[in-house]
């Protein structure tokens, strides 16, 4: 079976892992997934992540999930721009996310939160929203 949206798969694994109270989730790595993980760590949504090379040459990324008083830190994580419907926003159209959340964008200056994009004056593709 081919995977049409690896980012949606990553977000679903995080969501399912937290619902099942897993300490970590592992998935096949890519540069985009690594950058999304970096932003999630910087914003305090995951404890840490690490990348390892498997014997077959592929790289995997393991995300250490974060809990607060036994409850998942991530209340919701949702894919916005998808292969069938890309969503782009200019920095002027970036608004706050309910519940102190962040939108993660792919911009010409790299992967960043909507707050960073607004400060830098760049727009881009809205990958997902996290709160």
Swiss-Prot record:
Species of the source: Legionella pneumophila subsp. pneumophila (strain Philadelphia 1 / ATCC 33152 / DSM 7513)
Give the multimer and partner information: Part of the 30S ribosomal subunit. Contacts proteins S5 and S12.
Q: Which Gene3D superfamilies match?
A: 3.30.1370.30, 3.30.1490.10
| Known function | One of the primary rRNA binding proteins, it binds directly to 16S rRNA central domain where it helps coordinate assembly of the platform of the 30S subunit.
Which family is this sequence assigned to?
Belongs to the universal ribosomal protein uS8 family.
Record-linked PANTHER family: 40S RIBOSOMAL PROTEIN S15A (PTHR11758)
Q: Which GO terms describe its molecular function?
A: rRNA binding; structural constituent of ribosome
Q: Which Pfam family would be a valid example here?
A: Ribosomal_S8
Lineage of the native species? Answer: Bacteria, Pseudomonadati, Pseudomonadota, Gammaproteobacteria, Legionellales
Question: Which GO BP terms, alphabetically?
Answer: translation
Q: Which InterPro entries match?
A: Ribosomal_uS8, Ribosomal_uS8_CS, Ribosomal_uS8_sf
Q: What is this protein called?
A: Small ribosomal subunit protein uS8
Superkingdom in the source lineage: Bacteria
NCBIfam families named in the record: PRK00136.1
Q: Which keywords annotate this record?
A: Ribonucleoprotein, Ribosomal protein, RNA-binding, rRNA-binding
Of the GO CC terms on this record, one is: ribonucleoprotein complex
- PROSITE patterns documented for this protein: RIBOSOMAL_S8
């Amino acid at each position: 079976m081919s995977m049409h949206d690896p980012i949606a798969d990553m977000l679903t694994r995080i969501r399912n892992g937290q619902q099942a109270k897993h300490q970590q989730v592992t998935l096949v790595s890519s540069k985009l997934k690594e950058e999304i993980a970096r932003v999630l760590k910087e914003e305090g949504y995951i404890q840490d992540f690490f990348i390892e090379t498997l014997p077959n040459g592929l790289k995997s990324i393991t995300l250490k999930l974060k809990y607060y008083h036994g409850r998942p830190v991530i209340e919701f994580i949702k894919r916005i721009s998808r292969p069938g419907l890309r969503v782009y926003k200019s920095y002027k159209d970036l608004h706050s996310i309910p519940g102190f959340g962040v939108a993660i964008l792919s911009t010409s200056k790299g992967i960043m939160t909507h707050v960073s994009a607004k400060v830098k004056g760049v727009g881009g593709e809205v990958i997902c929203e996290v709160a």
